[in-house]
Design a protein with these regions (language model features):
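Short, solvent-exposed amphipathic helices
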Residues: 59-73, 84
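The N-cap/first-turn positions of alpha helices
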Residues: 1-5, 28, 60
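Core residues of bacterial helix-turn-helix
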Residues: 23-24, 35, 42, 63
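A short LG(V/I)-centered, amphipathic sequence patch enriched
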Residues: 39-56
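Residue-level detection of the helix-turn-helix DNA-binding "recognition helix"
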Residues: 18, 36-43, 75
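Interdomain hinge and pocket-entrance segments immediately C-terminal to HTH DNA-binding domains
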Residues: 83-91
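Short helix-boundary/capping micro-motifs
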Residues: 9-27
Length: 91
């Protein structure tokens, strides 16, 4: 899993950079910088930082939905590989 996607998802889940940073075992400034870098790359903010708790922007909502779909695909691939490994070792 891409670390940046996990970081952004954790901020979304916690609605707080500080809480997300604690959960991810990284500093809050480091997390904020990483999220800002992604926002700069896509050209739009993902979070409305003027609200408390944090809220997603419209682009952020689309981003999170896509991230959730990617997480599901990653899980299916991981399950498939685990099943192959189990079949291979069971032969």
């Amino acid at each position: 899993m891409f670390t940046w996607k996990k970081y952004i998802y954790e901020v979304y889940r916690e609605k707080s950079f500080s809480k997300a940073a604690q959960n991810l075992y990284i500093s809050q400034p480091s997390l904020s910088a990483r999220v800002k870098k992604v926002e700069k790359e896509i050209g739009f903010p993902l979070f409305d930082r003027s609200t408390s708790p944090l809220q997603l922007t419209e682009v952020g909502e689309v981003y999170i939905k896509a991230a959730e779909e990617i997480f599901q695909i990653e899980q299916r691939v991981e399950n498939y590989i685990n099943n192959l490994t189990t079949l291979k070792t069971g032969s």
